[in-house]
């Protein structure tokens, strides 16, 4: 099923220099006349050249997928006492125009320029001109792929940088190479209309040989919904008269129009019956590690990767394997962790908890000659366990690290179900029966059948008004999408990012205090101050007390402090563990509005010849 990537890899080096500048034009994209594709195979090769960019480590190979979506209230990367202009500056919202990890901006425009070239080449092709504009065909599917990739790149640009240059035609020899920024509302509205135009003439994943490794009709329907909720949501806007000001959070007046679009296109996919949640929650991600890509299940589109070529999934995110030179699975230098308040927000019986929150790591034991589990540091090592190198179809080999070849998930059917429920609730002012059914479908997979009556039907039926249903969706999307670079952007469009981060720090403190003193009560009185573990014969851990605050150590077990470590003492008083003030800095959170957008890199500003500038005090 990696045939598409083998084709992509053959094209990946074309026009991809190691030092790529914003709007730098590489042959053959420097054109003096319009391109035209004379065959489907020619157009297909051109599209593969666009997909090749998506897998680059500056895009979904690592940087865009695994740097830009953090930190938030459920996931974080660790940062230092002093802000750094590295990936850590992205995570703690202190990035300056000199930050070294913003090349994704440039590569998004490389992808856009290649997509624009494909769009022009197909539009000029007799195959396209003579095709039925109302029915799916391969030439029109290829056209839709190009527009979908372009839309995806503009979604990433606008939600990370705000207003950016908007280019809808491939760069040509005589073009203006210094475009200014376009309002993000205009950009998002345009690409939504693009996708609405091409969606009916594309094939569903099940109709394609490459299944979900190519953009397809179902993925485009989901992408329309995601873009529409972003266009209809909140975002930080600049004070054009005062670039040093933080700006303001703003929601467009026409937001309900876009919620209706989100409802319409998510409903369209639901009613098509093309996708289900047949695979278990664990299987969705295990399948990715095993290179299994069903065309009719939860996954709608994932960026194709290849072993020993690209992808940091399983290495920078997933189950942690400490560095060693003996395991055929290599090791994993995991950057991302979950917060303990998130871990303990799951209901009892929710099977997603133990997949999304892993309280252990793997370490090589020289005495036994194998990998064995050890308890994780609860402050900074409880990892997202959706992906594991131990699940890979082909082990990386000794000292294996990056380039796992595990695909990056862009959009799932579960996301479409929850976006539909959200849009319906907003449009009707209360949850509709169809919105409840969509939420129930997601929760049915999350809980065993014997809990469906209580945790699915009773729970959802009890959400009777707009606000309680919305709050439930805020939680559900956290429980469903941990580690998939979705949460931060959800909180932004809901105007909840700053509020949730402030709330998180209070919850961390309360958890530390209340778990140490359960008799004092509070919502965290029953979470464990300590957990207790012993080794099984196979090297895995037998952990007791993970879900209760036990008061004594069971015979044969070792005591290990857990939630109580969220606080430490200073001058005889408990304070929040100091590391959390690095991961979530008060200097950032105390500013209202919180500046979450990244500055445009100083080199891009310099190259723009005055057409671009930074705002928000950056």
Which residues fall in each region the model found?
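Bacterial N-terminal signal peptides
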Residues: 7-15
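Conserved, well-structured interaction surfaces
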Residues: 39, 44-48, 52-58, 80-161, ...
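Elongated scaffold/linker segments in the mid-to-C-terminal portions of large proteins
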Residues: 35, 40-42, 47, 51, ...
């Amino acid at each position: 099923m990696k045939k598409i990537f083998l084709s992509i890899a053959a094209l990946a080096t074309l026009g991809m220099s190691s030092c790529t500048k914003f709007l730098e034009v590489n042959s053959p994209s420097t054109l003096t006349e319009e391109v035209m594709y004379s065959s489907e195979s020619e157009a297909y090769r051109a599209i593969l050249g666009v997909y090749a960019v998506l897998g680059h480590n500056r895009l979904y190979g690592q940087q865009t997928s695994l740097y830009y979506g953090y930190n938030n209230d459920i996931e974080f990367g660790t940062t230092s006492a002093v802000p750094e202009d590295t990936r850590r500056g992205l995570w703690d919202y202190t990035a300056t125009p000199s930050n070294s990890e913003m090349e994704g901006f440039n590569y998004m425009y490389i992808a856009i320029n290649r997509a624009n070239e494909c769009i022009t080449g197909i539009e000029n092709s007799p195959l396209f001109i003579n095709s039925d504009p109302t029915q799916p065909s391969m030439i029109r599917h290829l056209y839709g792929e190009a527009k979908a990739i372009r839309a995806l790149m503009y979604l990433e640009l606008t939600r990370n940088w705000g207003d950016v240059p908007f280019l809808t035609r491939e760069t040509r020899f005589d073009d203006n190479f210094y475009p200014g920024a376009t309002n993000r509302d205009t950009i998002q509205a345009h690409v939504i209309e693009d996708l609405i135009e091409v969606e009916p003439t594309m094939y569903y994943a099940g109709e394609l040989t490459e299944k979900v490794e190519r953009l397809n009709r179902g993925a485009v329907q989901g992408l329309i919904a995601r873009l529409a909720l972003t266009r209809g949501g909140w975002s930080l806007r600049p004070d054009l008269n005062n670039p040093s000001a933080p700006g303001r959070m703003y929601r467009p007046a026409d937001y309900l129009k876009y919620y209706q679009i989100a409802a319409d296109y998510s409903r369209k996919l639901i009613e098509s019956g093309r996708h289900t949640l047949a695979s278990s929650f664990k299987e969705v991600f295990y399948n990715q590690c095993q290179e299994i890509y069903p065309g009719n299940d939860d996954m709608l589109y994932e960026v194709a990767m290849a072993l020993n070529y690209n992808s940091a999934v399983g290495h920078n995110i997933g189950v942690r394997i400490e560095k060693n030179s003996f395991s055929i699975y290599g090791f994993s230098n995991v950057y991302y962790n979950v917060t303990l308040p998130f871990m303990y927000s799951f209901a009892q019986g929710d099977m997603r908890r133990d997949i999304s929150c892993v309280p252990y790591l793997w370490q090589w034991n020289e005495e036994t000659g194998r990998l064995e589990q050890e308890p994780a540091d609860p402050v900074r090592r409880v990892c997202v366990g959706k992906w594991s190198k131990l699940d890979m179809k082909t082990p990386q080999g000794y000292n294996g690290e990056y380039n796992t070849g595990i695909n990056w998930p862009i959009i799932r059917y579960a996301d479409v179900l929850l976006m539909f429920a959200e849009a319906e609730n907003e449009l009707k002012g209360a949850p509709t029966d169809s919105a409840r059914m969509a939420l129930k479908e997601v929760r049915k997979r999350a809980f065993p059948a014997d809990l469906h009556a209580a945790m699915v039907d009773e729970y959802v039926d009890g959400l009777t008004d707009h606000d309680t249903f919305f709050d439930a969706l805020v939680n559900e999307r956290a429980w469903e999408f941990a580690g998939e670079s979705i949460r931060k952007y959800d909180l932004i469009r809901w105007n909840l990012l700053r509020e949730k981060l402030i709330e998180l720090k209070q919850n961390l403190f309360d958890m530390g205090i209340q778990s140490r003193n359960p008799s004092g009560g509070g919502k965290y009185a029953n979470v464990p101050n300590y957990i207790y573990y012993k080794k099984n014969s196979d090297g895995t851990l037998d952990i007791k007390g993970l879900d209760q605050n036990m008061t004594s150590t069971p015979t044969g077990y070792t005591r290990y402090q857990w939630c109580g470590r969220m606080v430490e003492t200073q001058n005889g008083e408990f304070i929040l563990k100091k590391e959390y003030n690095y991961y979530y800095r008060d200097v950032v959170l105390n500013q209202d509005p919180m500046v979450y957008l990244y500055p445009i890199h100083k080199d891009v500003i310099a190259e723009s010849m005055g057409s671009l500038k930074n705002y928000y005090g950056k």
